Amino acid sequence: MSMSGFMVDLPECVRRVEGVSGLPALEVLGPRSSGVVQLHGGQVTSFVPRGGRELLWLSPLAQAGPSTAIRGGVPVCLPWFGAGRDGGLSPSHGLARRARWRLHSVREEGEAVIVSLVVTPEAVAQLDGAEHWPLGLFATLEITFGDALGLRLVVRNEGSDPLTFEAALHTYLAVDDVRTVRVEGLTGASMLDQASGERSRVEGDLTFDGEVDVVVTAPKQPITVVQGRTEGRTPIYRIERENLPDAVVWNPAEQKTASLADVPDDAWPRFVCVEAATIKDDAVTLTPGQDTALGATYAPLAD
């Protein structure tokens, strides 16, 4: 099977399907979980553990294209986050989530299915903002479909000069109602409110009584997402991070959702973004020939 110039043999549990906006995608039907990976953005848009329910939220209005990132799933923010450390870069959250990634390999390890994708400077060359992509930056994303969803991003500097980048796994987690969700494991960490610019320490669990858009620096491991604040309190997701020291927590609430064309007005209670990141002061610099591995595991805790 040829996909974006790569000859890849697919196991029986993986097949090519039509993805968002009719673009190529892979459907994984593994022993422990199933899901979908879009080549646009190298983006996981579905993960369902065996006998469980969907982990990820995907907007029913999601679109994909050279100027459009898919709303939902796990967008890969690279090589900058937001407008970048200096606030002047565009498009928001970098070019990786708008690029056509190439399939490198699919393999089975025990009861896990692992999909590997790559993105190169050539893949972004025709995109708006391509001049801001470091010429030596190459990245591989390894997606593991097991009992948990594993993502491992390896960034390499194949150029002749040092390069600096930010990265985030902008995961949209599906929830019953964000207004009854708590995010645990952040207490005591430094927090930047991106809306107000105020810095503070996290006191207690994060809850959602309006728009939340915060960057939490170096929270403890793990982070747990809990549905229900008092009676019926149920831990639903556990998040472990590798070389991603920061956490970004976001929900637009009703007012901000009105300005998001690809999010239905009534959809905001159904997701919360808990992102594993290395951004702002934690941006990574690679010398020529150097690489680094960044990762996160999202484990479902309840059916």
Outline where the language-model segments fall.
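Beta-strand-rich N-terminal accessory domains
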Residues: 1-71, 222, 226-243, 288-303
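Asparagine-centered strand-capping/turn motif at beta-strand->loop junctions
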Residues: 37, 153-159, 300
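Active-site pocket scaffolds in enzymes
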Residues: 57-59, 77, 235-302
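Beta-strand/loop-rich accessory regions of lumenal/periplasmic or secreted enzymes
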Residues: 68-94, 184-193
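Extended, loop-rich substrate-binding clefts of extracytoplasmic carbohydrate-active enzymes
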Residues: 90-146
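Short coil/turn motifs at secondary-structure junctions
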Residues: 122-124, 158-160, 176, 301-303
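Hydrophobic core residues within well-ordered beta-strands of beta-rich domains
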Residues: 139, 149-151, 292
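Active-site/ligand-binding surface loops and adjacent short beta/alpha elements
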Residues: 162-164, 168-247
